[in-house]
């Protein structure tokens, strides 16, 4: 943590095709080795596949999928008197988005489809229907928080 001042958030330019800041942020999560144009191709390709299969607009499905993945609570380790407790804490909105996007991309990378665009599209469709490994990850995190609810008074 900085001692002098809090560092401000950087402005992210909205993506060129849909004008969405959320989608631009998502492309940055998908990007590897600074290859932004490749990340754009993957994301736009996935959104086209999703729109064809689901029959809804590109952004609508993306936001539905992300809504079903975003966690509301998570656990953080807190050391109290020699023992470590998993303390449930509420997730801030910015972190909520970041975790949801990261889990979506991680789940897509572990899938078996041929191209990354197909994997991402399949994971988005699953997430929009409350299925898939990204949604499972969110449920696991919520289950951990629920199991450790007794330690909620150790919040800081």
From Swiss-Prot:
GO biological process: translation
GO MF annotations in UniProt: rRNA binding; structural constituent of ribosome; tRNA binding
Role this protein plays: One of the primary rRNA binding proteins, it binds directly to 16S rRNA where it nucleates assembly of the head domain of the 30S subunit. Is located at the subunit interface close to the decoding center, probably blocks exit of the E-site tRNA.
GO cellular component: small ribosomal subunit
Subunit structure: Part of the 30S ribosomal subunit. Contacts proteins S9 and S11.
HAMAP family to which the protein is assigned, alphabetical: Ribosomal_uS7_B
Native source organism of the sequence: Pseudoalteromonas atlantica (strain T6c / ATCC BAA-1087)
Family: Belongs to the universal ribosomal protein uS7 family.
Keywords carried by this UniProt record: Ribonucleoprotein, Ribosomal protein, RNA-binding, rRNA-binding, tRNA-binding
InterPro entries: Ribosomal_uS7 (IPR000235), Ribosomal_uS7_bac/org-type (IPR005717), Ribosomal_uS7_CS (IPR020606), Ribosomal_uS7_dom (IPR023798), Ribosomal_uS7_dom_sf (IPR036823)
Protein name: Small ribosomal subunit protein uS7
Superkingdom of origin organism: Bacteria
